[in-house]
Amino acid sequence: MRVLITCFAVDSHFSGCVPLAWALRTAGHQVLVAGQPALIEAVVRAGLTAAPVGVDHAHDQMLAKVGADILALHDDRDYLEKRHDRLGLEFLRGHETVMTALFYSKVNSDSMIDDVVDLAYGWQPDLVLWEPFTFAGAVAARVTGAAHARLLTMPDMFLSTRERHLSMLDRLPAGRRDDVLASWLDSTLARYGHGFDEEIVTGQWSINPMPEGIRIDTRQPTVPIRYIPYNGQVPSIVPDWLREPPGRPRLCVTLGMTARTSNWSNMIAIEDLFEVVAELNVEVVATLSAEEQALVPDVPDNVRLVEHVPLDVLLPTCAAVLHHGGLGTWATAAALGVPQLSLGYMWDAVYRAQRTEALGAGLALHSSDLTPARLRGLLARILDEGSFRHRAGQLREAMSAMPSPNDVVPMLEKLTAERG
């Protein structure tokens, strides 16, 4: 098969595509990754073949200009069932309007979509796998007749709320069923002589790495896939000190890569964080950029500062991990059975943190509730209470039972033959 993977230019979203891309390659299939120019270095670093499309989006810069009001729309993005009573029609309509205008249409610009369609016309993929917000892949598949599927990297909050929104619209008179996302995609497809249907936002099926207990079920056909840690965003080198067992419980502290390269700031001042961990009887490994390290005047004796360290090697040596709520860190800790304290502050990070706490595999602390005292208390719990390690082990077992990327390839071959 020829498989085209499309992803907008955010490295953390692309990282979740890499293990399956390589499983397809090692099974003998041709794989081509299309992304905006800013993504190409990450694609090449993964050893994959890249095709630049469109121009770089300016989503982060736009958010900085729009201001805190738009960010606040995401800040309480709690999609647990107990909160669905607040997700009424007007809220969902407003949310989709904002997301379409300020996110979906920005990371899927006309130039990007045109280039992906032209690429697909020339290369003729059998299957298009698209990151779930990169609708350019679905458009290209529709125009060229390829099979296509969403390659999820997070719980499917988008589709679950989309389904809820559509069910509310269906109860309205025909003249009041405004669907901003559908209208934008319909006008886009019309440029190529095609029209919109819901398959453009759902894919023909979805590939989902979320385990039971974290996964959000929808009406969409789904192929489960095991999460495989990938460290390709940073130098993946094991330092000498990591080859020796720690002398006391080790705590990993990581605030992720996205805050280093975008307008998403850290959720806690580094000085406050170090004040908390300095009082704990633990060895702390904190991953901070050189710029962040330079801003810290005093480093506690029990803290080791590093710029980069492969998490899938570090975390098995740790009693717990304190992190920002990002998908890669969360999933790596979950796959390795490490208890986690997540400082999630928006959208899927909040959901994952709360579900992990509900499973007993970790604790959640929303950034709006974050104080040194609360952080200190939760760290003491997650380090001292053995139940977190036990429940984290159960989450690891659930993830290990899912099919590996290699095991998923035959299913993709079958579905492509049926749908393409």
Predicted regions located by residue number:
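C-terminal amphipathic helix plus adjacent low-complexity
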Residues: 377-420
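Conserved nucleotide-sugar donor-interacting segment of glycosyltransferase catalytic cores
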Residues: 94-182
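A nucleotide-sugar donor-handling region in carbohydrate enzymes
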Residues: 36, 175-259, 289-292
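Phosphate/nucleotide-donor binding subsite
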Residues: 54-123
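Donor-nucleotide binding loops and adjacent catalytic segments primarily
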Residues: 222-320
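N-terminal subdomain of nucleotide-sugar transferases
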Residues: 1-57
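A donor-sugar binding/catalytic signature common to diverse glycosyltransferases
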Residues: 21, 306-355
